[in-house]
């Protein structure tokens, strides 16, 4: 791993999240743990810096995590999202021990609160919006053949729903038409 010492004296290991996730997955496979267990641990380790990044943006730019960021966080972490919230808090405490700035701790708590509020209070709006269209409807409406493009379009529609830009089937069709024009 490549390391770097910052101006603040802290040592950073670039890429440790991805490399650590692969190392853990290899170890879990050698122990014959299930694919589900391996996938969950891999997601936790591979994504453990994301909340810290959201917190840094919150501190630096005074921007709370966007609906898009929240949607993508839970899309990518799946059932491990809550695990990551707890891990990020423990990781921050362990990193700073007794020198943790109160402003950083409060910001990390705020980001974690925002993530959990959206997961538990607004799941259908932000975290996992219901599908207004399925692949067959998209292929029929736009005369498409089965392809990765159909899946990418469905994902783009869901993300637009999570952002509040699409709120029904008609809006999903308009969004899809515009998206396809941009892609072609």
What does each of the following model-derived ranges do?
Residues 1-184:
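C-terminal subdomains that position terminal phosphate/3'-OH groups for nucleotidyl transfer/ligation
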């Amino acid at each position: 791993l490549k390391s770097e010492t910052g101006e603040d004296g802290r040592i950073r290991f670039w890429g440790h999240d991805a490399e650590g996730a692969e190392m853990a997955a290899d170890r879990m496979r050698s122990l014959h743990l299930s694919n589900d267990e391996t996938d969950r641990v891999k997601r936790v380790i591979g994504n453990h810096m994301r909340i810290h990044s959201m917190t840094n943006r919150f501190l630096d730019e005074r921007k709370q995590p966007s609906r898009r960021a929240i949607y993508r966080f839970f899309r990518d972490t799946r059932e491990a999202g809550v695990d990551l919230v707890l891990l990020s808090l423990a990781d921050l405490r362990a990193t700073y021990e007794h020198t943790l700035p109160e402003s950083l701790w409060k910001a990390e708590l705020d980001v974690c609160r925002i993530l959990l509020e959206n997961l538990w209070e607004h799941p259908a709006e932000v975290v996992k919006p219901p599908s207004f269209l399925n692949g067959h409807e998209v292929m029929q409406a736009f005369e498409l053949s089965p392809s990765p493009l159909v899946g990418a379009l469905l994902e783009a529609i869901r993300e637009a729903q999570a952002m509040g830009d699409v709120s029904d089937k008609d809006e999903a069709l308009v969004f899809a038409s515009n998206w396809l024009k941009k892609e072609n």
